[in-house]
C-alpha cells in the first residue's frame, strides 16, 4: 500500500460516526455512486431506483357486482336471475331492483362476478363490477 493510502486509512480510523456519514454522503455526490449497493468484483455497479408505492399494483381478488339500471320491461327476467344468483326471497329481490344502484353480490371471485354480470346483462340489466 502506498504512503498516501496508509495516511488516509489512519485518518479514517480517527473520525467520528457523524463525520463518516458526511464523508460517505460527499463521496456519493462527488462520484455519482451509491454506497448502499454492495460492490461485486469484476462487475459494474448497477444503479437501482427504489420502488415507488404507485408502481406497485395490487390485483384485486374479490369483486362486487352492482346493479345500476333495470329497464321497466326487463324487471321480471332480472328478478329471476337475481334470485338464482343469491339467496334473496321474492320481496328482497324486488327491493333490490327498486333502490338502485344496489350491490347484488359482494366479495366474490373474478370468475363468479363475470358470470353474474353476463347473466344479468343478457336479460337487460346494466351492471358494474368493482
From Swiss-Prot:
Keyword Protein biosynthesis found: no
Subcellular localization(s) per the UniProt record: Plastid
GO molecular function: mRNA binding; structural constituent of ribosome
Main location: plastid
One family name in Pfam for this protein: Ribosomal_L12_N
One of the GO BP terms on file: translation
InterPro entries according to UniProt: Ribosomal_bL12 (IPR000206), Ribosomal_bL12_C (IPR013823), Ribosomal_bL12_C/ClpS-like (IPR014719), Ribosomal_bL12_oligo (IPR008932), Ribosomal_bL12_oligo_N_sf (IPR036235)
SUPFAM superfamilies with a match to the protein in the record: ClpS-like (SSF54736), Ribosomal protein L7/12, oligomerisation (N-terminal) domain (SSF48300)
Keywords per UniProt: Plastid, Ribonucleoprotein, Ribosomal protein
GO cellular component, one term: ribosome
Subunit composition and interactions: Homodimer. Part of the ribosomal stalk of the 50S ribosomal subunit. Forms a multimeric L10(L12)X complex, where L10 forms an elongated spine to which 2 to 4 L12 dimers bind in a sequential fashion. Binds GTP-bound translation factors.
NCBIfam families registered for this protein in UniProt: L12
PANTHER family in UniProt: 39S RIBOSOMAL PROTEIN L12, LARGE RIBOSOMAL SUBUNIT PROTEIN BL12M
Family from the record: Belongs to the bacterial ribosomal protein bL12 family.
Function: Forms part of the ribosomal stalk which helps the ribosome interact with GTP-bound translation factors. Is thus essential for accurate translation.
Name of the protein: Large ribosomal subunit protein bL12c
Gene it is expressed from: rpl12
